[in-house]
């Protein structure tokens, strides 16, 4: 199964990385981005590992050790990454 990022999700990752780099360090930002990519990469093999989403036809993956949530949709041949959200953000 392939992973496809929406423009919104890509923007979310950029904002997360920029925030961490500004308020922490570049290496911390790269580490968080790598952890997010690794967790999302596992969705290609285990697309149902996240819980049922709060919006119909979505799933939500809580990232272990990070305060972030991945909102995604699964189809026959693709996992579509819809959003990356901080756990404190109101969703939906």
Tell me what each language-model feature is.
Residues 2-58:
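Basic, Lys/Arg-enriched alpha-helical interface segments
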Residues 55, 65-66:
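Structural motif corresponding to alpha-helix initiation and N-cap regions
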Residues 66-69, 73-92:
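Enriched for short, Lys/Arg-rich terminal
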């Amino acid at each position: 199964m392939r992973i496809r990022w929406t423009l919104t999700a890509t923007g979310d990752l950029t904002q997360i990385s920029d925030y961490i780099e500004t308020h922490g360090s570049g290496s911390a930002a790269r580490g968080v981005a790598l952890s997010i990519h690794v967790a999302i990469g596992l969705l290609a093999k285990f697309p149902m590992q996240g819980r049922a989403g709060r919006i119909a036809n979505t799933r939500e993956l809580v990232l272990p050790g990070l305060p972030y949530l991945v909102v995604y949709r699964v189809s026959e041949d693709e996992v579509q990454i819809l959003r990356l959200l901080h756990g404190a953000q109101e969703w939906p």
